[in-house]
Design a protein with these regions (language model features):
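A short beta-strand motif characteristic of beta-propeller blades
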Residues: 45-51, 97-102, 149-154, 201-206, ...
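Extracellular receptor-binding modules and their adjoining Ser/Thr/Gly/Asp/Asn-rich linkers
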Residues: 1-69, 73-77, 83-93, 102-120, ...
Length: 475
């Protein structure tokens, strides 16, 4: 009589693979297109505190030349100075370098962008220690640290609501802001990075009215800068305008309303898969629900499709958007109901966008920014964690690999760390790291990585239980 368990007359089949994310013994394992082992479903990494201080204006910028994320913030524990740190990601684990001061004075309205021509990070902010002038500074990341050049004033007047993007066709940084020295008119200026410094051309007004919450993004298919904002001179409607950079100046077409209601917390990104601009905002005409809309640039104008909700029936405050080139989707981070910080993923189709269910990122906070790390293949969040004294905090989110009818290969034999070696028990092996199975029962892989007796969609057989803790992997 033979024993149907670990004494099977079948050679054990195992394979060592690099783990794309941390795996636990007994996890169902999928194979990625790059040959790494992963598990179905999303993985949210642990929170890592950047510094034990209160923070505001939390910003994240991805440096694609170094595969690092720079997180910057206003340090409430040190006279509101400008501070930052470099974040490295492995799997969904964030490692934070030493904190660096980039501005010794009080700062606010902090934003930034990455200049892929000079491989520099550019931070923009209001320097409250220097008459609240609009200021920019260039940072160079090396290893786990960053160094800065000398700050440069781009507007010798009080500025508010700055935003920055990089025009890769002209190798220029474009900063959009409200110029308090000129009735808060919407204004833009072109910057050129050289070495560790930045110089500017003449400013151009894009909206001759009080402007709030401008967000600049670059349309790389049309080589245009798109600025979206709240036009306080037109009932606070959501509005966008297309800019064309020439040398050190920028000119604009006519403005287009994308939301005929009051908006707030405007953010935007560019979808390089579909060549569309995606604008996100809180729709005050609809209970401040988080909303997104798709824009199509043609020459110097932009047209919009139908808006879609990303926050369900909740508010969508402090929204920021980033594009994921690996999946061709748009990620939106925002503050939802009860100040819970959340993430939603949107897919553009034609001139519309649809969103799946939101994921909770942090239980309480306001400022939240995100970037997509194209090396680690994860979103990196920089949050103001209100549940932990408003400390600047980072964490990574792997959207995971979707289960298909072909990519399930077996089970993890033991625990494995991200980017470490994982031993995978393949077809014909018996994995003994399961619990509460029924011997003789067929089990199916679920889309969240668990196994169950009912097939998911797609239907993927995991194997047959041979005891309460063992499963014979389907060959």
């Amino acid at each position: 009589m033979s024993y149907l368990g670990r004494q099977l007359n079948v050679p054990a089949s195992r394979k060592e693979l690099t783990a794309a994310v941390a795996l636990s013994a007994g996890n169902a394992v999928l194979i990625k297109s790059d040959g790494k082992a992963t598990k179905p479903g999303a993985t949210l990494g642990s929170e890592v505190v950047v510094a034990a201080v209160g923070s505001s204006y939390n910003v994240a910028i991805f440096d694609s030349s170094n595969n690092k994320t720079l997180v910057a913030y206003q340090d409430a524990g040190d006279s509101d100075k400008g501070k930052c740190a470099v974040v490295s990601v492995s799997g969904t684990t964030c490692t934070v370098g030493s904190v660096v001061e980039f501005e010794a004075g009080n700062i606010s309205y902090l934003e930034g962008t990455f200049d892929s021509n000079s491989n520099k990070v550019v931070l923009t902010y209001r320097d409250n220690g220097n008459s609240s002038y609009g200021t920019a500074i260039v940072g160079t990341i090396s290893g786990d640290s960053v160094s800065f050049g000398t700050p440069t004033v781009f507007e010798s007047a009080t500025t508010v609501f700055t935003s920055a993007t990089f025009d890769s066709s002209n190798n220029k940084v474009v900063i959009a802001y409200a110029d308090n020295g000129n009735s808060n008119y919407g204004t833009a200026i072109v910057g050129t990075v050289s070495g560790t410094g930045i110089s500017f051309g003449s400013a151009s007004v894009f909206e001759s009215a009080n402007t709030n919450s401008p967000s600049a993004t670059f349309d790389s298919s049309n080589n245009k800068v798109v600025i979206s904002y709240r036009d306080n001179g037109n009932s606070s409607y959501g509005t966008s305008i297309v800019g064309t950079v020439s040398s050190t100046s920028i000119s604009f077409g006519s403005a287009t309303v994308f939301e005929s209601a009051e908006v707030a917390f405007v953010s935007s990104t560019f979808d390089t898969t579909n060549n569309k601009v995606v604008v996100c905002y809180a729709d005050a005409g609809n209970s401040n629900i988080g909303t997104a809309i798709v824009g199509t640039v043609s020459s110097t104008s932009i047209s919009f499709g139908t808006a879609a909700v990303f926050s369900g029936s909740e508010q969508g405050y402090y929204s920021n958007a980033a594009f994921n080139p690996d999946t061709g989707t748009v990620g939106v981070a925002y503050q939802g109901g009860s100040d819970v910080q959340k993430f939603a993923e949107g897919t553009v189709s034609g001139t519309g966008i649809s969103f799946g269910s939101a994921t909770t990122i942090n239980s309480s906070g306001s400022y939240i920014d995100l970037v997509y790390d194209t090396s680690a293949d994860v979103f990196v969040f920089h949050v103001r964690d209100a549940g932990n004294s408003s400390r600047p905090t980072v964490l990574a989110f792997d959207l995971g690999t979707a289960l298909t009818s072909e990519n399930f290969i077996g089970f993890a034999e033991e625990d494995a760390t991200a980017n470490g070696l994982a031993t995978i028990q393949l077809g014909g092996s018996v994995n003994d790291k399961q619990t509460s199975l029924t011997a003789g029962q067929t089990y199916f892989v679920q889309t969240d990585g668990t196994i169950g007796t009912t097939a998911a969609s797609p239907s993927v057989t995991a194997g047959t239980a041979v005891s309460a803790t063992e499963i014979l992997v389907k060959g």
